Amino acid sequence: PHAGKKDQTGRIYEMADRLRQHGLTCQCLLTQRSGGAEEIARRLVSSGEEVRLYACGGDGTLNEVVNGAAGFDNAAVTCIPIGTGNDFLKNFGPDAAKFTDAENLWDGEVHPLDLIDCNGRQCLTIACSGIDARVAESVHELGDSPFLSGRGSYLAAVAVNFLFRGIGQHWRVTLDDEVIEDDFALVSMCNGRYYGGGSTPVPEARMDDGVLHTVLVKNISRVKFAGLFSAYSAGRYRSLPPEVIRVVTAKNVRIQSEDDIVTCLDGETIHSRDVRLTLSEKRLNFFGPKGCDPNYGAGPK
């Protein structure tokens, strides 16, 4: 309930009371620390009883609940957005607004969704490694500053990473059976379409088609990267030079480096020198408002 700037505990209890009016047994469980939502979710789904989990927070809270519930047929998950980042729900288009009220969710349809497995952690939307992940990590580090707004934190994070740190890193990238060793600015595996506040690197990505799109961007100068980033962010990768950017549909991607690789999973960052990304097909039961589409507005394949 503290994922955003304002405590939403009272609102959550009010929605729970309305769910009980539909004859549902409902519990409000509050987290006290990072990782708490995953532990609670795992404990509930391990009982074997049918359970519906409402993750009240942002993308990070939802990611924790998903990691606790993924792979359990008796469990379904949804999200009530009260956090500072809710890129996942953008995949539902105009129906995203309906997720703010549990009244729209309690009898909602279940959608089996694919996930990305990253070193054993599950990711809903996009797993990115490189400069964009480092920016995301810096945003979190700067977010508690009393002198910076949310937008100010983002701009400061971009400045720190672009001006004072190198963009690229030397990686060995394996795409199924193909091996590439080069300097990369970023590698992003896309199950969904949105991350980083609304960037859509692969607009045709769908969360239930058994296909993952991986974007590889070679290391280039700061000036060139700044020039192409808007096109990358808007999903116009086909308009960019093929020697700089490439999109593949490998099911298994591995990134290896002698230095730490920062990887961002649904807004949460991890460090590793060996990043393994694979498809977890139909791993999550997700429910939303009646008639909603998790691939609303997705471009043609």
Q: Over which residues does each language-model region extend?
A:
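ATP/NTP phosphate-donor binding region
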Residues: P1-L53, D293-K301
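ATP/nucleoside-binding phosphotransfer catalytic cores, i.e., glycine-rich phosphate-binding loops
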Residues: Q8, L175-D176, E181, R206, ...
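Catalytic core of DAGKc-family lipid kinases
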Residues: R20-H22, L29-T31, G71-A185
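N-terminal glycine-rich "phosphate-gripper" loop used for MgATP/nucleotide binding
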Residues: A55-G60
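Short Gly/Thr/Asp-enriched flexible loops that form oxyanion-binding sites at enzyme active sites
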Residues: T61-D73
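Glycine-rich phosphate/pyrophosphate-binding beta-alpha loops
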Residues: C128, D132, S188-V202, T269
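Gly/Ser/Thr-rich active-site loops/lids in small-molecule metabolic enzymes
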Residues: G143-S153, P203-K224
